[in-house]
Every structure is written in C-alpha cells, then in structure tokens.
C-alpha cells in the first residue's frame, strides 16, 4: 500500500488539485434552490450539488471522449472545461427563457444595485418580497466560469486515475485508444464521480442555501470550503489510488 502511494504521489497531488478546483467552482454557480424555482430568488431553481455535478460530469464525459484520440493533458482539460461550460450555459439559457417568457419577470439581482458587468440597475426590477429572480448577466458569466473550473477539476481527477491504473498493470503507457472500452474506464469514472460529489457537497454547507455568483457576499466564504476540500481530496486520493493499484488496473 505504501509503495502504491509513493509511486503515484504526483497523480495523488493532481487528484487533490482537481478536487480543490471542483470545490472552488461551486461558489461561482448561481444556485437559487426552491425559491428560484418559484422566481423568488436569483439563480437556477435546483440544488448546489445537482448543478455542480451536472456540469462536472458533462465535463468528465467530454474529457473521456477526448482521451480516445489524444493523451495530451492540456487538450483533455480544455475539452472537459468546454463541455461543462456548454452544459451550464444551456441550462441557464433555458432557465432564463422560462423566467422571462413563462413567469414574466426581469432577470435581476437583489445582492447588488448595479450589475457589475452590464452596469444596468437591478433594484428597480426586483419584485417586492423576493430576493431577485432569473439570471442577470453577472450570474450567467459567473456560472460559466464555475462550469469551466469544475470541468477542469473533474477531468484532472479522471485523467490521473486512468494513469494510476495504467501504471498498475496495463500494457499501454499513455491514455490512448487502447483504454477505450476497458474496465479501467468504469472504475476510474466511479472514483472520479465519487470525488466530485464529495467536493460538491462540502461547499453547499459553506454556502448555506442560495448564491448568485462571484458578486454575492457569500462568495467570500470560499477559502473555508477549499481548505476542507483539500483535506477531503487527499483522503479520497489515497483511497482511490490504493484501490486501483491493488486491483492492478483490473
């Protein structure tokens, strides 16, 4: 077990970095929860973990697809990032259409008087008794940034786990077509998803309900979540590396 840990210390470090990126990314995603579902709060009307996991897992799938054709890490991370950003962007666009044309409210934030990006007044359009509604531009941009960071984090975790399995007994040296369809893909994906959920849940306790994006006062709490996720990711990395190494890459 000690040999497995020492032999894969670099990949464990990358897994930990990926987990920290995932945790940080959650704070960028505009989460409105149940109030947003009723257009009584700014953000997307679902939970923190669901949104983060949706974007991150889409990025993981994109990264896995890219690994069919190349073992270039920057390209794999870019693919995962873009995949996650597209997913969260489409989610926010559809949500905005429903809020504007279905509910009939103007996307606006109750956290700031002026949108930091468009400089449009927000307080004039916030309905009485609500904490904003819809997805103003600043929340949209923040969500895309969060999706990108989460996609990079998830891709980094998945790539590292694949490499751990490769070094544990598979013939191929890098991540190439020979990995496609192999059982190692399933095992690495399971661990990557697990690590992603762990690091998505921790910030949800830190946020405590809803958050509009990087302009929200709650965003300043991110260092606490990042430190907690750093510790959790180290533990997850140890378990994942030891398990995959003991299985000999399946």
Curated annotation (Swiss-Prot):
It comes from Methanosarcina barkeri (strain Fusaro / DSM 804). This is Tetrahydromethanopterin S-methyltransferase subunit D. Pfam families: MtrD. GO terms for molecular function: tetrahydromethanopterin S-methyltransferase activity. It is found in: Cell membrane. Pathway: One-carbon metabolism; methanogenesis from CO(2); methyl-coenzyme M from 5,10-methylene-5,6,7,8-tetrahydromethanopterin: step 2/2. The chain crosses the membrane at residues 9-29, 47-67, 86-106, 144-164, 184-204, 230-250. It is a multi-pass membrane protein. It is an enzyme of class 7 (translocase). Its main location: membrane. Keywords: Cell membrane, Membrane, Methanogenesis, Methyltransferase, One-carbon metabolism, Transferase, Translocase, Transmembrane, Transmembrane helix.
């Amino acid at each position: 077990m000690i040999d497995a840990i020492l032999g894969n210390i670099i990949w464990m470090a990358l897994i930990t970095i990926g987990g920290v990126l995932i945790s940080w990314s959650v704070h960028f995603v505009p989460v409105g929860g149940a109030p947003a579902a009723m257009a009584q709060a700014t953000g997307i009307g679902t939970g923190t973990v669901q949104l983060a996991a949706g974007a991150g897992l889409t990025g993981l799938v994109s990264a896995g697809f890219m690994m069919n054709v190349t073992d270039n890490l920057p390209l794999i991370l870019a693919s995962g990032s873009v995949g996650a950003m597209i997913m969260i962007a489409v989610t926010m666009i559809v949500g905005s259409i429903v809020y504007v044309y279905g509910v009939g409210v103007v996307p606006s934030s109750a956290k700031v008087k002026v949108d930091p990006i468009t400089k449009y007044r927000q307080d004039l359009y916030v309905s009485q008794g609500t904490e904003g509604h819809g997805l103003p531009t600043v929340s949209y941009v923040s969500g895309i940034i969060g999706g990108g960071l989460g996609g990079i984090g998830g891709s980094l975790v998945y790539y590292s786990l694949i490499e751990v399995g490769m070094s544990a007994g598979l013939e191929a040296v890098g991540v190439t077509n020979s990995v496609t369809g192999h059982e190692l893909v399933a095992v690495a994906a399971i661990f990557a998803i697990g690590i992603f959920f762990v690091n998505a849940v921790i910030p949800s306790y830190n946020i405590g309900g809803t958050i509009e994006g990087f302009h929200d006062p709650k965003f300043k709490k991110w260092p606490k979540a990042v430190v907690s996720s750093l510790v959790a990711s180290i533990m997850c990395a140890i378990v994942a590396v030891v398990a995959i190494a003991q299985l000999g890459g399946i």
